[in-house]
Amino acid sequence: MNPLHATVLGAIQGLTEVLPVSSSAHLILIPWLFGWPESGITFDVALHLGTLIALALYFRRDIAELVVNALSGLTGGAHSSATRLPWYIIAGCVPAAIVGKTLEEPIEAIFRANPAIIAAFLIGFGLLLALADTLGSKKSRMDQIDLKNAMMIGLAQCLALLPGVSRSGITITAALFLGFSRETAARFSFLLSLPIVAGAALLKVGHLVRHGVPEGELQPLLIGVGVSAVFGYVSVALLLKLVQRYSLYPFVWYRLLAGAGVLLFIFNQ
């Protein structure tokens, strides 16, 4: 992989892993559209690490607070929504961890080579996001999340294995349907994604440690980490500011246009 491809794909990963537009769809469709070779698992590691760095840096205070609250609850401190939230996040990650470990490879094998289905998922789940943003009451706050809410959002996260769905998109959609505000939905979505992204990164780092970095891949790998981290950090900040003032319809329209554009490209080939 050359440095230009690494930069473009790093930027795409950083932006689309966080925004509700599906990083997996973009990382499959962009190389397919331009005829680029597949990036491979080494570069996959770089992209996941970059995203993890961005999320960990942006939510460093939230993470520290979650750890303190979890320990407080374990050591006899007063039980509250704050001390329970870390455990709700962990519980919400369990379904996606199990499904991901079991089905990630067969799902990727089925859908990676089918851009039309990916485009259909972009459109279909974009419409679902629009419906949630329109019908959701948007009243509930972070301190009102309970185990049932966390598990329902966590179950929805399992659908993110399908390229074109979007991890942040489907969890924000589920949270909106459950009545949470846009900001709470987005923030909880990111906190819920941290253990999953970290787990995926660690699994792929393990593969990298066992097999080593292929010759000539170190520079693109480092570029991928850095670029995806920078763009990921910026896009988290951007999304959290946007949802405080505006609807999620700009992302819905983007998904519809991107999906329709891919379908038109396929049918005109």
Swiss-Prot record:
Its EC number is 3.6.1.27. Signal peptide: none annotated. One of its GO terms (cellular component) is plasma membrane. It catalyses: di-trans,octa-cis-undecaprenyl diphosphate + H2O = di-trans,octa-cis-undecaprenyl phosphate + phosphate + H(+). It is found in: Cell inner membrane. Pfam families: BacA (PF02673). GO terms for biological process: cell wall organization; peptidoglycan biosynthetic process; regulation of cell shape; response to antibiotic. NCBIfam families: PRK00281.2-4 (NF001393), undec_PP_bacA (TIGR00753). Bacitracin is thought to be involved in the inhibition of peptidoglycan synthesis by sequestering undecaprenyl diphosphate, thereby reducing the pool of lipid carrier available. Belongs to the UppP family. This is Undecaprenyl-diphosphatase. It comes from Geobacter metallireducens (strain ATCC 53774 / DSM 7210 / GS-15). The gene is uppP.
